[in-house]
Structures are given as structure tokens and as C-alpha cells.
């Protein structure tokens, strides 16, 4: 047990010793803390020990170990440890190590101080060198001070010499500049004699370079003297230089005029040619060579001299006057040459186009256009700058054209000729030629505008006379009023010309191709039938009423020839007279045939009129101003009543009130031609609808009117005698013998017979006159609605006036659905005649063996049964609308405003306004 306890105590002691040894180098609280330098040395020793190994011989030198961490703390010396060696006998214990460590540490410290000792020696050496250098610098500074004093003395002497030299040089330069300025100024005064001598020299040529230099010197000297008028004798020398300039201008004027005169003489009197100017006019090339060849040759001589003057126009007014004189002389010479030639040429053109005013105008104006262009081109071969005198000269040439054409224009009576001349002047001349070359044709444009205004004035005057004579005072012949015979004749001619050729199938095997071809041919027949339904043959050939055709032709002529305000006034008058003429013709046709024919005639031509004036892009509204004197009468009557206040001094002076209240008022009225056409069309449509309803259900309308008057009389009687009001008093209609069920039944049967008999005639007339399905439908719709409303009104009267069920059965009054079916069946019967054309065309088409071809042909050719079904279906929706619109108003009161508003511009009139 003692041994065990002893062992445990020893182990406990060893554990404590180990713990204490571990606490020597504890990171948190070490018992023996080492410095950084000591830790570094220990690391070095550890590395050396690790590298040497336990079997390292005693006398060997360990391998040099590099420090692992080169970034030591500041101030720690970095020394090589190559020469540090362990003791020969090695390190046996801790004491040996500590002794060896003390020696090594002392040696290391000594080695570290050696560097500082060496550096101290170097500093002491540098200090000695600096002391020696300071001594030498002090000696050099003493010498530099002496040298600076000497330099300052020399600098002062040199500066004084330079100042004196500069003053002398400045004075010399001033004197030299003064001398040069005097010479320069005297130069402008000393040139006058030299210039006079040169200008008086007989050998001086205007086209030479010496003459150019003379002009340059004259301009230069004259400009200088004018800029310095205060110089001595400046006015005298100004006069002298003006004289020199006048001499030079005279030389230029004489030279240019002589060259131009020679060209004029050679043109008017050619020496080496046997032909004169009149014979030369027959050939254009010869005429151009005669009238422009000599001048083009002279232009080369004159151009160089003229350029001398043109470049100096801004220097002096003398040059401007000289240039004006030269241009005037040139234009005068050209006028003497060209005026007779132009006059003779226009006379020849007038003779060649005698009686043809349009060709005369076109040829004469075209000739003047070429003359103006050639004259401007020739003018700019002489002169570079334009001149207003050229325009005056060309206007003189163009005046010959004006004087020649105006006598013809003021005697032309045909509107077509005047309109054609307007087009020639406005479009061909002004818009085409003048706009392409406005500068050369400015004078021609002025004369052409004057001619155009004269033609327009004559055109307006003749248009007024034409409207009065051929439209207002037009007396139609029997052929003009032959309606509907004329339309029927044109329709029969059109049907005979539209007979299609039969189709043949080339091969029975190509059944598919033949079926497709049959479908295409069927479509073409259907399209031709549709076109036939939309276009009246009379409209296609322009066979309108003469006044309508003349009005539209007149307006189309005036539209492109006169200004918009003038056209608006003329169109207002023309449309007004045309409407009156159509209304007059419609009345005569209605008196000769039937009112329906007259009204359809008027509707047809009013629609044509409205369609044809639509392309005119102009406002047909005209403003008229008038004076309203209505207040003058009232004011005068008030003045007579207030005679005692005529001279009253107060505010109620009668005379002042008369002057203030009796002033006539200016009123402006806007007249719209298009609205006038629509207003007349509305009136005619109302009349036509009323007459058509009376024609179809006249007995029923008469009965309803009579019934209304009877019921109104009974109502007034009942209101005057209240005691007589009994339930039977309201059955006065039933008690009337003419309103018995039998009489009403006969009226209804007669009305139905009239519908069946006359509806086809009515629709045939509408198709013949209007030839437009949409227009026919729009006009026929209120007729149909009025008929249905009349029967609905009759049914309401019978129901509310004591008629029993038996009476209703006796009367056999049809319902709205029955009336609609009746009208539809009658419409189908009326359409049979129209559909005969398509049926005949369909029969001529060869049937195909394929089912597809037959089906396609069946789809394209509509039969009468299909039409009936379509009509029944289309009328079903209209019945409800008719019932809702049914009212006790008279049958003839239809909303014709909607009819006119819905009327489309008919496509039947294909002839354009042109």
C-alpha cells in the first residue's frame, strides 16, 4: 500500500510539474514571458536543431537556415547566423544552453552595433567634406559679388545707348511713313493728266487691257477724292476725273452702239442675200438665222465691253446710266427689227387659220412664246443683268398679239369656242409655258392675263344670254316631251343590242371545265342584267331633257374657265332656270300623259342634276345683300304722331328718334343651289307619292276622307249638345248608308283590283324612268307604307265605330299582313317583265352535264319563286314597323324629307360633267 501511495504521489508531482512547465509558454498567462526577439532566436535555434538532427557530429557546422519571417518588428537587426556555431562538446543541459545563449546574444548585439559604428564614421567623413565645400562657396560668392557690380555698371551704359538708338529709329520710321503717305495721296492727284493723255490716244481700243486699267484708275482716284472732300483742290480734281469718266463712257457708248447699228443694218438690209425679210419668214430656220445670226455675232464683241460696265455699276451712277442707255439702244434697235416681223408673222397666222379662232389663238400665242424666249436669250448674250426695259419691250411685241386677237374675241358667240380659248390661255399658256419659264415669259403672261380676262368677260356675257335664250325661253317640241315613248324606244334598242351569243361545249370529256365556264358565263349574264337594271339606256346615251343637258354642259364649260365667285353666281342662276324648265316640262308631260309620268320625269332629271353638279368642287352658296325698309315706315308713322316733339330739346326729340330708328337695315341672304335642287326634289317626291297612293287606293282614300269629315262633324255636334251624348251617338258612321258593310266591302274589293292592276304599271314606270333599284325602293317604300297605313286605319275605324264581327266578315277588310302580301305578289308580277331579259339570257346558255355547273347556274339565275320567297321574308320585318307607324293621320302625309335624304346619287347618269 505504501508503494502504491508513493507511486501515486510521484505521479501527482510529475503531473503538477508538467502543468507548470506548460504554463511557462501559455498564451493567456505565461509564467516566463519571452520577448519577440527571444522568440525569434528560439525559432532560429529550433530550426538549426531540427536541420542538424540528433546524429550530427560534434565538429560539423549546421546548415544555414533562412529566417522564416522577414517582416520583423521595427528596429530589430537582421544578421546572418552562418558563423554562429555550437560548442564542440555540445549542449548537455539547460545550464550549458543558457551559458551558450548569453554568449551568442552578446555576440549578436555586438554585431548589430557594428553597423551603426560604421555609419557614424561615414557621417563624420561627410561632415568634413561639407565644411570644406562651404569654404569654397564662400570664396565663390565673394567673386560673384564683384562680377555683379561690374555687370551693373556696363548694363547701365548699354541701356542708355539702346534708348538713344530706338528714339532715332522711331523718328526715322515716322518720317518715312509720312513721306510714303504724302506720295500715296499725291498719286491720286497726279494720275489725271496721264489718264487724259491715254483716253485721247487714237490707238486706244475699248476692248483692250489698257482701257480696263484706265477705268480702274479712274474709279480708284474718283472714289478716293469723294471720300476725302476736305483735301485741297479736291473739288477741282473731282471734276477732272468726272470728265475722264465721261470720255471713257463716251468711248464705250460709241463702240457698242456702232456694233449694234451694224448688226441691225445687216439684218434689215442683207447685202449678199437676194431674199428679203418677208420671204425669210416662210422658213423658220432661215428666219432665225436672219433675225438672230448677226446679233449673235455682235454679242461676242459687245459682251466683253459690257462686262466692264456691269462690274462697276455699284461704283458710280454714271455707269448705271451708261448701262441703261446701252440697253435702251439695244432694245430700240431690236424693236425696229422685230415689231414688223412679229406683226407680219401674226397676220400670216391669222390668214392661215381664218375662221378657226382656237387654232389662231394657240398658234399666235405659241409663236409669241418662242419669240419672247429667243429675245430673252439674245438679250442675256449682250447683258448679264436683267432690265425692266426688256419686259416693256416684250410687252410691246405681245401687244401686237393682243390687238390682233381681241377683235375676234369680242365677236365670238359660241360658248364652246370661248371655253376652249380660255383653256388654251389658262392651261396651255399660263400653267404650262409660263410656269416653266416665268422670267422670260413675264411680259407674255401679262398680255395673256388681259386676253384671258377679256375672254372670261365675253364668256360670262354669252353665258347669261345662253341661259336666257336656251334655258329660260326654251320652248320644247313634241319630241322633247315624248315620254315615256323615248325611254321605251331606247330600252328596246338596248335589249336588241344586248342579245348574248349561245355557248358551246367543245368536248364532252371536259365536263369540269365546261361547268366552270357555264358558271362564269352565267355570272356575266347576271352582271350585265344588273348593269342594265342600274343604267338607263337613255342616260348612257346622254338623252336627257335639252335644258338639263345644256345647263350641265354650260356649267362644265364655265367651271374651268372663270373664277370661283363668278361661277357661283352663274351656277345659281343656271340651276334656278333649269329647275323651272324641268318643272314646266314635267307639267306639260303630266297634262299630256299622266301626272305620274310628269312627276317621274321631273324626279329623274332632278336626280341627274344633283348627281352631275356633285363633282364641282365649289360652294354653290351665293350671298345676296338687300336693304330692309320695314322700320322706315314705322319710324315715319311715329314721327307724324309726335309732331309737337320735332324741335324738343330733350332726349325724346321726334326727329332724332326718326333718324335713329328709321335707318334701313342691311340683310344678307344665303342662296344655295344644291339645297334648291333638294327642295324641289322633295316637293316633287311628295306630290308623286300622293298621286301614286291615290292611283292605287283612290276609293279607299276618298272613303277615309269622307269618314273623317263625318266623325269631326259628329264630334262637334256632341260637344255642343251634351244631353244628346249616348252610346249610339258614336256609331254615326255605322248608321250612314254609304258606310254600310256592303259598301265598304265593295270599296275594298275595288281598291284591291286597282292595286293588282296598276301597281305593275307604276313599278314599270319607275323602272323605266329611274333605272336604279335603290332609288326605286326608297321612293316606293313610303307609297307602300301609306297603303298599309290606310288599310290599318280603316280597320281601326271599323273596330271603334260599332261594326260587329259579322260586319267585319262582310267587309272583308284585309289585315296589314294580307296587304303586304298583296303588294308583294303584285310586285312579283311587275318584276316578271323585267326578269324576262335575264331568263332569256339564261335559256341561251347551254346546260352542262355536270351537277356542279347546273347548281352554279341555278344559284346565279334567280327564279320567280325564289323572288317571291325573298319578298315575303323581307316584308315580314316591315309589317311591325308599319303597325307602329300607323296613325289616324291622312294617308298622303308621308315623311318625304326622309325620302330625299335617303335618295342616293343615281349611278345611272354616267356621262360626266365634262
UniProtKB/Swiss-Prot annotation:
Coiled-coil regions listed: none
Name this polypeptide is given: Conserved oligomeric Golgi complex subunit 3
Residue spans of biased composition, Basic and acidic residues class: 874-883
InterPro entries: COG3_C, COG3_N, COG_su3
Subunit structure: Component of the conserved oligomeric Golgi complex which is composed of eight different subunits and is required for normal Golgi morphology and localization.
Topological category with respect to the lipid bilayer: Peripheral membrane protein
Compartments reported by the entry: Golgi apparatus membrane
Keyword Ion transport: no
GO aspect biological process, one term: endoplasmic reticulum to Golgi vesicle-mediated transport
Keywords, comma-separated and alphabetical: Golgi apparatus, Membrane, Protein transport, Transport
Pfam families given in the database record: COG3_C, COG3_N
Family: Belongs to the COG3 family.
Its job: Involved in ER-Golgi transport.
Start-end of Low complexity biased regions: 53-64, 884-897
GO cellular component: cis-Golgi network; Golgi membrane; Golgi transport complex
Encoding gene (name): Cog3
Location of the region described as Disordered in the Swiss-Prot/TrEMBL record: 53-84, 874-914
